[in-house]
Amino acid sequence: MHNKRYSMIVIALAAVAAMIVATQQPIAAQAPQGGGQKGGGAKGGGFGGGAAKGGAAKGVPAAPLPTQPTAVALPTLSAKITGPGAIYDSAVSQWPGRDVKFYKYDTDEYFVSGTANGKPYKTRLVIRRPADNARFSGLVLSEAMHPAGNAHAFEYTSVYLMSSGHIAAEILTGTSAVPLAANKERYADLTLSNDQTNEILAQVGALIRSKTGPLADVTVRKQVLFGTSASSAILTNYLPAHMVYRTPEMQHIYDGFMPTSNGSVIMAVDVPLIQVPTQHEQENIATNRQDGDAAGDQYRNYEFAGMGHLDSRNNGPRLPQSACVNPLSNYPLEAYMSVALYHLLRWVDQGIVPPRADRILIDRNRNNDGSLMALDEHGNAKGGIRNPYVDMPVAKYTARNTAAPTNGNALLCGLSVYTTAIPKAELKKMYGSKSNYVKKVDARLKELEKAGWSLPVYHDLILADAKAVDF
């Protein structure tokens, strides 16, 4: 009964999160803010989860922002939480065989208490860090936990993140229903509300950088905030607060931002921001904001051909094949989200300006796959950042899978990509032999790695997909 109730809560929250994203409404707006470059409302975006015009969600009182840069109060950090019972695991979808144990990472949980919007709060903070401090890179990837209870920023970059020695921080900013349903005794005292979100993100982010926080034994050089889908709405809603909230030393709390699975037009900020719309966001034209390098407009838009709104490759615990009618895509979303994170971290930490990329081409013809994308002869997107899955294709990648008639999941299937295999006879005409195909993929990977569009840490993992193709 407990597990059934927990599953129902997760499904309900996921549905709420999807509705928020689909309608471009803010999850936790505390002050009027715009999604546009000049502070206007969000435009376009499909399922991107950007800020909607008007700021505060109906019924949620806005907390007015300071008019000048203001230091936030540091909240109180608990000792490491070790019980009762097991920690709620928000990162169940890591690359098989490449989890925290493989990379010798520790997962530490804390409770954080403070005051936000005039009310006390107590929330959860999870730190995933190298067991050996000497491996820490000095860089922290922080995220607001997705409303459905997922640490997607960590999951979607975990191989790159852990192989590089970065630390991942996960901050609970909204409802505690998911961890509470998983372990009532452990999480019974958590108390927070959506109208406290921005201040919680600021206060806990400042705590992470401080010498009284969970990383007091190491030196944090830079910290970025990542969001995907509904949690990217949390991120974009935070941006006006970013412009005024500071650490007690009056430094930036977050040095860069990465909203993903998000196609809205996002306001300009004073630190680098890389946005990653997916093929789902091309059902409506994704943001037309242009890349920029100048101070106050450090922006990149990275659109990866073949990428879906949701990872369906390593998401078996949440989205098994049996839930959807069509074959789930094996496209390695993580490998390419990590490319964007790699460039963002170099930008904020070393000042290395990232390359600009072509956008996915648009023909406004919905009679092909229902999107506005221009498609090649195999049915895959033209333009965008390329990869072997679309350059040496063995399948067509189409957004919006269909839920299975029995025990299906309409929400997650609809947010995933499915594949249609290219017939083996056609593959033989295209590549001649399997060995020749593998050589082509290997050569293409090396080209992309040299150009900065694929990371060497994923080379063998991607090449293994090519070696598994049979024709």
Model regions and ranges:
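N-terminal secretory signal peptides that target proteins for export/translocation
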Residues: M1-Y6
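Hydrophobic transmembrane signal anchors and adjacent membrane-proximal interface regions, especially
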Residues: M8-I11, I27-A29, V159-M162
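Bacterial N-terminal signal peptides
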Residues: V10-A22
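Signal peptide processing junction and immediate N-terminal pro/mature segment
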Residues: I20-Q33
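C-terminal His-loop and adjacent cap/lid subdomain of alpha/beta-hydrolase
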Residues: A31-F471
